[in-house]
From Swiss-Prot:
Region named GT8 domain: 3-265
Family matches, as Gene3D superfamilies: Spore Coat Polysaccharide Biosynthesis Protein SpsA, Chain A
UniProt-annotated binding residues for UDP: 11-16, 106-107, 227-233
Pathway note: Protein modification; protein glycosylation
Pfam family, one: Glyco_transf_8
Species, as recorded: Streptococcus pneumoniae serotype 4 (strain ATCC BAA-334 / TIGR4)
Additional remarks: Encoded in RD10, a pathogenicity island with an atypical GC content that is associated with invasive pneumococcal disease. Pathogenicity islands account for greater than half the genomic diversity observed between isolates. The main function of this island seems to be correct synthesis and export of pneumococcal serine-rich repeat protein PsrP.
GO MF, one annotated term: glycosyltransferase activity
Protein name in UniProt: Glycosyltransferase GlyE
Residue sites binding Mn(2+) per the record: D106, D108, H227
Job of this protein: Involved in the polymorphic O-glycosylation of the serine-rich repeat protein PsrP. Catalyzes the third step in glycosylation of PsrP in this bacteria. Transfers galactose from UDP-galactose to the terminal glucose moiety of already-glycosylated PsrP (using the short substrate PsrP-GlcNAc-Glc). Has a very marked preference for PsrP substrate that has already been modified by GlcNAc and glucose. Has hydrolytic activity against UDP-galactose but none against UDP-glucose.
Domain comment (free text): Has 2 domains, the N-terminal GT8 domain that binds UDP and Mn(2+) and a C-terminal domain that assumes a Rossmann-like fold. The GT8 domain has UDP-galactose hydrolysis activity but no galactose transferase activity. The C-terminal domain probably binds the partially glycosylated protein acceptor in a continuous, surface-exposed groove that can possibly bind proteins with varying degrees of glycosylation.
Length: 406
């Protein structure tokens, strides 16, 4: 029985969720014990909550990596119309991934078999392993499948080198971040066999340039990874490339089919179902909610509701990476009231101007309220709070919140 999880990274936005999930299903159909990191900016928590259960039952996990904030800006130009800005997200892999080695996969691909040999490939001192672009008809390597030496990327600040090179060259390159990756790593990578990134999506290009040798490559058995590059995607209403049906097979496959296959092989683990023991709420008019990241990490069994009457700053939106934090931007007093009614505890943790609605609802519905010493309201007496705790010792707040659990 495998004890360690293999690290995999996908990146994409909510508009691409069907493609992301299809690629994930194909990967999980043939590989278990996967720790999948999904770099994104806008995929809802509910999707993560359900898919995470499936991964956990196969001995893996799913990590929601929110690229929200100025440090994750990806507003570089890209000359390929079928590729959006999220392709640059792979630059930030060392920010989120803790494993020394990680497999990055584009979302427009299908895995057809066991990738153990790929996961176990020794990278040595190379920065990554990748397959040649378009079977040698392209330039350099294709960046859709990368086995990354994450330890080396982290120690040598590769993220910043990629950003600096992109700032300098993005208007001059033809293939976006793929060109940048080729420029930076040049000959400092290992070559993968074509079967690990079989670019079936190049069919249209191969036919255009009369590359008959590509159509002579056997497709039985199927290559281990089919990559539907180019604009000729199999999920379009019409496409002309081969193996469109393989993509649809996995897209329409139910997760139960995948799970039952692993269960039949005695790969079955309990999922960590999210059962909250306490509901807490805060109304904020500020981006700064004291120690909320720390509290969310320390108290996974507590559901934190963060409400604002306006748009929220990135610092608050990024909290959605925690499965136990729900944010409500642009809410209204009557909606806040319903959340307070359903909550067990009011956390007066926001800085700057306080909004009286919160205190009125706390009083009306007799909800207990606690605060840090640097966030309690100047307009309320200490007896309005059931506890005020030092912000310099947040573990005391953790203990206080735990004391209210059912």
């Amino acid at each position: 029985m495998r004890n360690t999880k293999r690290a995999v990274v996908f990146a994409g936005d909510y508009a691409y969720i069907r493609q992301i999930e299809t690629a994930m299903k194909s990967l999980c159909r043939h590989n278990s014990h996967l720790k999948i990191y999904l770099l994104n900016q806008d995929i809802p928590q509910e999707w993560f909550s359900q898919i995470r259960i499936y991964l956990q039952e196969m001995g893996g996990d799913l990590i929601d990596c929110k690229l929200i904030g100025s440090q994750f800006q990806m507003n570089w130009s890209n000359k390929l119309p079928h590729i959006n800005h999220m392709t640059f997200a792979r630059y930030f892999i060392p920010d989120f991934v803790t494993e020394d080695k990680v497999l990055y996969l584009d979302s427009d691909l299908i895995v057809t078999g066991d990738l153990t040999d790929l996961f176990e490939l020794d990278l040595g001192e190379n920065y990554l392993a990748a397959a040649r672009s378009c079977f040698g008809a392209g330039v350099g390597f294709n960046a859709g499948v990368l086995l990354i030496n994450n330890k080396k990327w982290g120690s040598e600040t590769i993220r910043q080198k990629l950003i600096d090179l992109t700032e300098k060259e993005h208007e001059n390159v033809e293939e976006g971040d793929q060109s940048i990756l080729n420029m930076l790593f040049k000959d400092q990578y290992s070559s993968l066999e074509d079967q690990y990134n079989f670019q079936i999506g190049y069919d249209y290009g191969a036919a255009t340039f009369k590359h008959q040798f590509i159509f002579d490559i056997p497709l039985e058995p199927l290559p281990l990874i089919l990559h539907y590059i180019s604009q000729d995607k199999p999920w379009n209403q019409f496409s002309v490339g081969r193996l469109r049906e393989v993509w649809w097979e996995y897209s329409l496959m139910d997760w139960s089919v995948i799970l039952n296959e692993w269960f039949s092989k005695s790969v079955k683990y309990p999922s960590k179902s999210q059962i909250f023991k306490l509901q807490c709420v805060n109304l904020t008019n500020s981006w700064c909610v004291e120690k909320i990241d720390y509290l969310a990490e320390q108290l996974p069994e507590v559901h934190f509701h963060i409400v604002a009457y306006t748009n929220m700053a990135n610092e608050l939106l990024a909290l959605t990476r925690f499965p136990n934090v729900t944010v409500y931007p642009n809410s209204l007093p009557m909606l806040l009231e319903q959340i307070v009614i359903a909550s067990d505890l009011y956390l007066d943790l926001n800085h700057d101007r306080k909004l009286e609605d919160a205190y009125e609802f706390v009083l009306k519905y007799k909800k207990p309220m606690i605060a840090f010493d640097n966030t309690c309201s100047e307009n309320l007496s200490e007896i309005s709070y059931e506890g005020i705790y030092p912000s310099s010792i947040p573990k005391k707040m953790v203990a206080a919140i735990r004391s209210y659990m059912r």
